[in-house]
Regions:
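Single-stranded RNA-binding regions, centering on S1/OB-family and related RNA-binding modules
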Residues: 1-228
Length: 228
């Protein structure tokens, strides 16, 4: 089965009144509802779709773009709360679910929160506000003796997660925590924002200091102005 919570390139193998069936590459098929079908699609075409579970927990495909996919952090709005948990708008027909057991604090309709999307032990896509369960404090090699996956100056993707006295805690590449210090911030940013950034320093304790501009940017700008 095509893994739920991710984008896949799947081949159209059958057409029915209610939509197209796509080959899930493992001997099964997944439905793309008719209202989601791109114009002029035909059997044999390969379509880029996002696969998730419908209200009956059956795999279903969509051409809509969710606000996040599996193993990513996102800033989502709470649309409802019931006796089992909270529901978040992630851009698809079926809302993302946050069980009470993985809520750092109780969520309320109309509020927004940072969440991490993962598969629970039943195979459902769920969200958690307990980011520390998934985001690592320290970078580490995949295998002993190998270089660290990040080094000083590397370009990275940042998710601004929390304001602190020092600046902002940010999630780096959906995997590690890092600190963006006040002294390295030159324009307004906000919690929930996604930004391009850089590794300022991999510290001796394997934690990450971050910056929003490449190293040497401050020195280069005045020189560039003089040349112009």
């Amino acid at each position: 089965m095509a893994e739920p919570g991710r984008y896949h390139h799947l081949t159209v193998i059958e057409e029915q009144p209610h939509g197209l069936y796509l080959d899930d590459a493992e001997g099964g098929k997944v439905l793309l509802p008719r209202k989601q079908i791109p114009a002029n699609s035909a059997i044999g075409d390969v379509l880029k779709v996002f696969v998730y579970l419908d209200s009956d927990d059956r795999p279903i495909a969509t051409t809509l773009r969710p606000k996040a996919q599996l193993h990513q952090v996102a800033w989502l709005n709470v649309v409802d709360v019931n006796q089992t948990g909270a529901f978040l708008d992630w851009g698809l027909a079926k809302d993302s679910f946050v069980p009470f057991s993985v809520q750092k604090q109780r969520l309320e309709p109309g509020k927004s929160c940072a969440v991490y999307l993962y598969l629970d032990n039943t195979g459902r896509i769920v969200a958690s506000t307990k980011l520390n369960r998934f985001i690592k404090d320290e970078v580490a090699s995949i295998w002993p003796g190998e270089p660290l996956p990040l080094k000083n100056g590397d370009a990275v993707k940042l998710f601004i997660a929390q304001r602190t006295e020092l600046g902002y805690k940010a999630v780096v590449n959906n995997e590690y925590w890092g600190i963006l210090y006040n002294t390295d911030i030159r324009s307004a940013i906000r919690v929930g924002q996604k930004l391009d950034g850089f590794i300022k320093r991999v510290r001796e304790d394997k934690r990450l200091d971050l910056m929003l501009e490449p190293a040497g940017h401050e020195k280069a700008d005045p020189l560039a102005k003089r040349i112009l």
